[in-house]
């Protein structure tokens, strides 16, 4: 097995293919390359770049560079008509364990750019396949150049200064610009991508309990930062210093937590109006601002090492590569930061729904009037306590039943259910029962109410219509006539019309005299009864005794009818 990753390995490959370093140089000259390649300097094979489209030339020396081993390989020199399926079949035929194949196309025309990428299942699979098939693969009778993709390059040697974000050579022990030692302000370049993280993306103008301090010296510690904040004379609850997870290096900005928004606003005003050159820490002017809501986010899947508690739950910093190093000043109670546990109320058993409620399918929108009707029914029917006779006499002592008024509290209600709720659950009613002055005045008023309700009803309107000189017998007859129907009165306009049409008393209406024989009695709805309810209508002129008789008569005929059936 040849070692393709050494310089001798390249020379052996070129000799097998009938090429030498000299004719490679001639080939490069004929193709107008920038670099002159000679046998004395074979290392230039890895660094030269052609001026033209190198991906289309499968015979160029660049295509014979195997590259840095990784899971992806690049296939160059494909025909424009080839598809991903053809590439997959060719790779599977050679025993390649490929997971995905991506053919690169033009964005506008979607035409093939004649090169593709193939990703293997593992790094070892790609190495084994390249050792067996490098440098070409035959697809549809055409030799296609294969090598490792350039995505995985060798790690850059060097380190980045955390204090000034300047790249330094690996042999430097201190930053050449700010002279900070390497062990205090360095990040190894390689697996971690270096980007400027200075807190500029966390700034907001919306007031909150958090303030962000930017442009801090990256060599500061928690104690040093806290001592510098003491000159502002502010009440800080916690200090969050933003650090990298992989080496705990300070990023140069921190977040302060206050008790409420008023405290943070005072601290912001003090920092921005600080006398002299402004608010400084370690001889550096510090920028102070609010943070937005997306800086500290809920910790759903984050490790417990990086999250911190608050009253609303556990939070983490939004950047996955950074975390908050917490410093709590002396004298601050840490129990106040624990999340508040919410006790879940046990689910109550569902009560049987009343037949008065109107069921509506969940998929349809409930009309406003229908929803209002259901809510009113629930309010009247639900949670009304049952009272015994003794309790009712005691509790309803100050209730004007006919008017639905609590005389003691001087409150009028819309339904009997509201009255019962008031006398059993109202705190005001219980307090008024202990007030002797209110109780005595309510007793007097209820005495008058009972006297008024005990007097028989007099139809004073009918009495005023009667001639003053009439006898008592005439008054009684007029009273009876007012309670009865006015259908039989001869002075009635309707009666005169019927008589002129030939109608006789006792016969039915209509040509065949098969219509109604009795007058239609005027009726009204009982108060508090819903529309359509059976027995909701009563005659206007009927007394309570007549109503009981009419009800008994209807029940008798109904039972008699059922027995006959």
From Swiss-Prot:
* Zinc finger boundaries on the chain: RanBP2-type: 153-184
Which CDD domains does this chain map to?
RRM1_RRM2_RBM5_like (cd12313)
Question: What Pfam families does the annotation carry?
Answer: G-patch
One molecular function GO term is: zinc ion binding
Give yes or no: UniProt keyword Calcium.
no
What SMART domains does its record include?
G_patch, RRM
Which segments constitute the G-patch domain?
Answer: 490-536
Zinc among keywords: yes
Keywords, ordered alphabetically:
Metal-binding, Nucleus, Repeat, RNA-binding, Zinc, Zinc-finger
Q: Name one GO biological process term.
A: mRNA splicing, via spliceosome
- Whose protein is this, by species? Schizosaccharomyces pombe (strain 972 / ATCC 24843)
ZnF (C2H2-type) spans are 404-429
Localisation per UniProt entry:
Nucleus
User: A cellular component term (GO) from this record?
Assistant: nucleus
RRM domain location is 71-151, 209-293
Q: What is this protein called?
A: Uncharacterized RNA-binding protein C57A7.13
């Amino acid at each position: 097995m040849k070692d393709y990753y050494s310089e001798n390995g390249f020379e052996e490959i070129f000799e097998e293919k009938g090429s030498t370093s000299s004719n490679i140089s001639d080939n490069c000259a004929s193709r107008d390359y920038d670099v002159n390649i000679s046998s004395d300097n074979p290392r230039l094979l890895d660094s030269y770049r052609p001026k033209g489209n190198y991906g289309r030339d499968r015979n160029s020396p660049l295509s014979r560079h195997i590259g840095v081993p990784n899971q992806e390989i690049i296939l160059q020199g494909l025909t424009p008509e080839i598809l991903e399926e053809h590439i997959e079949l060719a790779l599977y035929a050679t025993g390649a364990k490929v997971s995905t194949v991506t053919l690169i196309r033009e964005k506008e025309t979607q035409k093939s750019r004649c090169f593709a990428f193939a990703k293997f299942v593992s790094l070892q699979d790609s190495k084994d396949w390249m050792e067996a098939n490098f440098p070409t693969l035959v697809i549809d009778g055409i030799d296609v150049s294969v090598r490792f993709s350039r995505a995985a390059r060798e790690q850059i040697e060097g380190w980045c200064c955390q204090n000034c974000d300047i790249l330094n050579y690996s042999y430097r022990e201190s930053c050449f610009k700010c002279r900070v030692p390497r062990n205090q302000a360095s990040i190894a370049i390689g697996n971690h991508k270096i980007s400027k993280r200075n807190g500029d993306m966390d700034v907001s103008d919306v007031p909150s309990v958090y303030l962000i301090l930017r442009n801090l010296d990256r060599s500061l510690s928690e104690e040093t930062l806290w001592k510098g904040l003491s000159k502002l004379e502010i009440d800080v609850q916690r200090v969050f210093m933003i650090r990298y997870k992989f080496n705990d290096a300070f990023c140069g900005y921190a977040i302060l937590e206050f008790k409420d928004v008023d405290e943070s606003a005072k601290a912001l005003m003090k920092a921005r109006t600080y006398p002299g050159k402004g608010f400084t820490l370690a001889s550096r002017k510090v920028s102070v601002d609010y943070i937005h809501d997306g800086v500290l986010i809920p910790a759903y899947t984050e490790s417990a090492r990086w999250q911190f508690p608050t009253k609303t739950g556990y939070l983490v910093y939004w950047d996955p590569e950074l975390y908050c190093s917490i410093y709590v000043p002396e004298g601050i109670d840490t129990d106040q930061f624990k999340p508040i546990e919410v006790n879940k109320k046990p689910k109550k058993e569902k009560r049987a729904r009343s037949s008065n409620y109107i069921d509506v399918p969940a998929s349809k929108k409930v009309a406003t009037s229908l929803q209002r009707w259901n809510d009113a029914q629930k309010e009247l029917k639900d949670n009304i306590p049952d009272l015994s006779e003794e309790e009712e006499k005691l509790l309803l002592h100050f209730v004007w039943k006919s008017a639905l008024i609590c005389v003691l509290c001087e409150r009028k209600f819309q339904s009997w259910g509201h009255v019962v709720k008031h006398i059993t659950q109202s705190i005001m009613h219980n307090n008024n029962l202990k007030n002797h002055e209110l109780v005595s005045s309510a007793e007097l008023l209820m005495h008058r109410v009972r006297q008024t309700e005990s007097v028989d009803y007099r139809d004073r309107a009918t009495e005023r219509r009667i001639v003053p000189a009439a006898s008592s017998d005439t008054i009684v007859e007029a009273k009876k006539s007012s309670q009865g129907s006015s259908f039989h009165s001869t002075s009635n306009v309707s009666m005169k019309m019927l008589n002129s049409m030939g109608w006789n008393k006792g016969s039915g209406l209509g040509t065949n005299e098969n219509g109604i024989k009795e007058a239609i009695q005027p009726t009204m709805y009982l108060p508090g009864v819903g529309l359509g309810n059976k027995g909701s209508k009563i005659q206007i002129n009927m007394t309570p005794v007549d109503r009981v008789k009419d009800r008994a008569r209807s029940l008798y005929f109904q039972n008699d009818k059922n027995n006959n059936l």
